[in-house]
Structure formats: structure tokens, C-alpha cells
Amino acid sequence: MNSMTEQKALELAIKEIEKKFGKETFSQSESFDNQVIKSGSILLDNAIGVGGYPKGKIIEIYGNESSGKTTIALQCVKECIKEGGSVAYIDAECSIDSKYLSHLGIDPTKLLVATPEYGEQAFSIIDALIKTNMVDLIVVDSVAALVPKNDIESSMEDQSMGTHARMMSKGLKILQTSLSKHKTTVIFINQVREKIGVMFGNNEITTGGRALKFFSTLRLDVRRSELIKSGTDVIGIRSKITVTKNKVAPPFKNCFVDIFFNKGFDPTKEIIDFAIEYEIIKKSGSWFYYNETKLAQGRNNLDSYLKENNEIYDEIKKLVFDEIDKNNK
């Protein structure tokens, strides 16, 4: 069989398969390549390695309490809406607040919010939204709050082991099938628990069993590292984000992001951090210089100066992105 005959035989086989199972059976491998939703943090986009959260994939953001997981997810919501995307929020915890959304720069009227009564209903809603092909991003808050219907309807004495994990496994299989044909990104917010009886090594485990680990293209481990203060007032937290699983770029990269209360990320500050790291802005003593020009004395004054001088800031920003692109090639 020569190469032309083999190619023709393959084309005929593909036509037969598409005739039997539908035109969407096959797609080009490049169909979702380089399509991302920005995280809102240049540092995090750089750690992920492709410039943001990949479209058409499942993402897990997990960590301990008060580490910034929800705000990190909401920053992605903000970026998606800013680019004209459609976003749904599955509020299983019933904790979303319109005032907080407004503080983060998110218009609450542009966010579709669902509050499912039980876990299976949440998965049905997510699957239906994916199949519309009209929703770009779905955030699920949180895995621990996706309680199986059987657990809700049963008495405390009748609770059985493993129902949550089984529900997650079944639901994720359904979502994965739908996502293979659509562009929606689904972010699951998850918590960590301590394993009982573990004396040595890592005693932490995420809720919901192993299925989410398996189906996730990207897993982000979020840990609060320190408080950000202005004088004696706590104005935010610094969190370490580690990419523990990455199927679109090399894994295990990490970054430290500053999350300010009622604001979220500060992109301007991150640009300045990168500019100093790449020596686009140079430091001598307490003074900062750009192209031999003295900008400001002290980091706070530098931040204020660049926020007030847009032309110089935009010039530095372009150089930073050029450097990031060069390093990611």
C-alpha cells in the first residue's frame, strides 16, 4: 500500500466514522492551542506558561482557608468579562456578595449566578451551560459544598461512605465529554483536609476524591505566606501559587502574588516587579533608574511615580512583555 492509497483509506474511514457518530467526532489538534483566559496576574500567567487559563479545560484551584482562592478565581472572571466573555458562577456555598464583586471591578449584572440545591443538580447545570457554547467561563465554588442528593435526603445515621467521590467522578466524566467539543473553561475551587492517621509525610488531601485531580488540565496550590500591611493595618495577603499539574506547559513553577482586600491583584505593581527583576528598571542604593534617568527614591515612591506617568509606564510595560515572551519561547 503506497502513501496515497493509505491516505485515501484513512479519509474514507474518517468519513464513515463521522457519518456514524457525527461531524464533531474529529477536530484539529490546534483548535484550542494558544486560546486562554487571562488570570489577571502577569506573575500567575507566566507561571502557568501559556499566558492564562487554557480554554475548554478543567482547572482546580485548591488550598487552605483564607489563602485567596476565591479572589484568584474572581480575577479571572473579571478578565473574561472585560474581554466580552460570558461567565457563570455556581455558588454552592451561597457566599457570593455583589458589593465584593463591585469592589473587585466586576459588574454583578454581567455574572450569571446559580445556587444548586445539591451536587448532581450543579453538574447538570454546568453541563447544560457548556452545551450552549455561549458560556466562556464557569466557576464552581466549591467542591466541598457539592453535596450529593442522597446525603441531603438521608438522616445522619444513614450516611454512606464515598458518595461525594462517586458523584464527582460521574459528574466530571460527563463534563469532560462535553468540554471535548466546546470552548468553555471550568474552574473548581477546592479545599484541603488532613488525612486521619498519617504520621509522616504530607498529610493533606483535597476533597471530592481523586477524579478532579485526574480530569484537571491545570492544578494550582494556593498558600498564604504573609500579611501585607500599611502601618499597623492589614490591607491584603501575599500567597504562594504552585502549579502542581500542568498539561499545557512545564509544571511545578510557582509565583508569589499580592492580593489586596477589596481590590484583588495589582497589575501595575507586578509590571514593576518584573521590570526590576529583568533590570529594565535598575536600582542603586534606594534610588530607581530607567535609561539612566532617575525615577524615584524608595519602592512606594516608584509605584506612585509610574502610576502617574503613563507614557513611561507603558514603555516599561512593553519591554517587560517582550522579555516574558522571549523567556517563554
Swiss-Prot record:
It comes from the Bacteria. Its main location: cytoplasm. Pfam families: RecA, RecA_C. GO terms for molecular function: ATP binding; ATP hydrolysis activity; ATP-dependent DNA damage sensor activity; damaged DNA binding; single-stranded DNA binding. SMART domains: AAA. GO terms for biological process: DNA recombination; DNA repair; SOS response. GO terms for cellular component: cytosol. Keywords: ATP-binding, Cytoplasm, DNA damage, DNA recombination, DNA repair, DNA-binding, Nucleotide-binding, SOS response. PANTHER family: MITOCHONDRIAL DNA REPAIR PROTEIN RECA HOMOLOG-RELATED (PTHR45900:SF1), RECA (PTHR45900). Can catalyze the hydrolysis of ATP in the presence of single-stranded DNA, the ATP-dependent uptake of single-stranded DNA by duplex DNA, and the ATP-dependent hybridization of homologous single-stranded DNAs. It interacts with LexA causing its activation and leading to its autocatalytic cleavage. This is Protein RecA. It comes from Malacoplasma penetrans (strain HF-2) (Mycoplasma penetrans).
